[in-house]
């Protein structure tokens, strides 16, 4: 039995690829593996803000969250996307349970204090109603796993006073993987893994260690936005997860293979 945390971006929830994910999830759950899903919803939140005439304010890649923005995140992430995702999973034979920070305090958070952020100048930045994860209701998740339910967590936390807080989905997934001592954190992305040549899917690198990552950065094989993504992933390993898998452009069975036969699909960081 393995414990897997699966991070899905908001863009995959309404894509045909989700059905591939769902069918593979059913195979994993039927094999008595414990699976939790964390999802975001950035693109949909931005689209709704635009329709409502609200400004989307980004600071160093993070969404500034005022009261109006938090309402949008509740509607979109904890509402529409969580329901739609659970419905698609249910249609594929998976038994999901939709959760957010206020659901049994599943995602416990505190409001993030102002801090200096790379790319945002020398002064501390206040991101508004944005949270830092301080814990999870692990007994609740454990009970769901025992009954073969799949927790589906929206990336909203809640503090002890009942204040909902917006949290980056990758952060929630990474910290959940550490808290569960997950065998794998699987990041579903737009690429089939880390590639030696970004134009050639067959150049996938099956496994990368920290030392190999540093060498590939030095020789220019890994560059651009993939560098911070992999750096963050290696931090997940330090936080308690056993491996991180970067996976995308899925074919049937890829998710099962990536979890049960590490290196056979996507790229495994270890």
From Swiss-Prot:
Listed pathway(s): Amino-acid biosynthesis; L-arginine biosynthesis; N(2)-acetyl-L-ornithine from L-glutamate: step 2/4
Site (Transition state stabilizer): 7, 229
Keywords: Amino-acid biosynthesis, Arginine biosynthesis, ATP-binding, Cytoplasm, Kinase, Nucleotide-binding, Transferase
Binding positions (substrate): 41-42, 63, 166
Gene Ontology biological process terms from the UniProt entry: arginine biosynthetic process via ornithine; L-arginine biosynthetic process
InterPro entries the UniProt entry points to: AceGlu_kinase-like_sf (IPR036393), AcgluKinase_fam (IPR004662), ArgB (IPR037528), Asp/Glu/Uridylate_kinase (IPR001048)
Its EC number(s): 2.7.2.8
Catalytic activity: N-acetyl-L-glutamate + ATP = N-acetyl-L-glutamyl 5-phosphate + ADP
Leading EC class: transferase
Localization terms from the record: Cytoplasm
Keyword Nucleotide-binding attached: yes
Gene3D superfamilies: Acetylglutamate kinase-like (3.40.1160.10)
Molecular function via GO: acetylglutamate kinase activity; ATP binding
Listed HAMAP family: ArgB
Entry's family note: Belongs to the acetylglutamate kinase family. ArgB subfamily.
Role of this protein: Catalyzes the ATP-dependent phosphorylation of N-acetyl-L-glutamate.
Protein name: Acetylglutamate kinase
Organism this protein belongs to: Anaeromyxobacter dehalogenans (strain 2CP-C)
Upper taxonomic lineage: Bacteria, Pseudomonadati, Myxococcota, Myxococcia, Myxococcales
């Amino acid at each position: 039995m393995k414990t897997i945390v699966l991070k899905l971006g908001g863009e995959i929830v309404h894509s045909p690829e989700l059905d591939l994910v769902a069918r593979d999830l059913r195979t994993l759950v039927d094999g008595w593996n414990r699976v939790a899903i964390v999802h975001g919803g950035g693109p949909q939140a931005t689209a709704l803000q635009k329709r409502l005439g609200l400004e989307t304010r980004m600071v160093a890649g993070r969404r500034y969250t005022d009261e109006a923005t938090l309402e949008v995140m509740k509607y979109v992430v904890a509402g529409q996307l969580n329901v739609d995702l659970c419905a698609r999973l249910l249609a594929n034979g998976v038994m999901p349970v939709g959760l957010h920070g206020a659901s049994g305090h599943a995602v416990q958070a505190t409001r993030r204090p102002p801090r200096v952020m790379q790319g945002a100048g020398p002064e501390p930045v206040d991101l508004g109603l944005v949270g830092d994860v301080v814990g999870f209701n692990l007994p609740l998740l454990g009970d769901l796993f025992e009954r073969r339910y799949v927790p589906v967590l929206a990336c909203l936390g809640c503090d002890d006073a009942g204040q909902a807080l917006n949290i980056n989905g990758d952060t929630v997934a990474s910290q959940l993987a550490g808290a569960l001592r997950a065998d794998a954190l699987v990041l579903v992305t737009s690429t089939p893994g880390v590639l030696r040549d970004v134009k050639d899917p067959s150049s996938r690198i099956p496994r990368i260690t920290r030392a190999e990552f540093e060498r590939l950065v030095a020789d220019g094989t890994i560059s651009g936005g993939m560098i911070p993504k992999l750096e963050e992933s290696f931090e997940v390993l330090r936080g308690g997860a056993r491996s991180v898998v970067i996976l995308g452009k899925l074919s049937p069975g890829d998710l099962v293979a990536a979890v049960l036969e590490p290196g056979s699909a996507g790229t495994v960081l270890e």
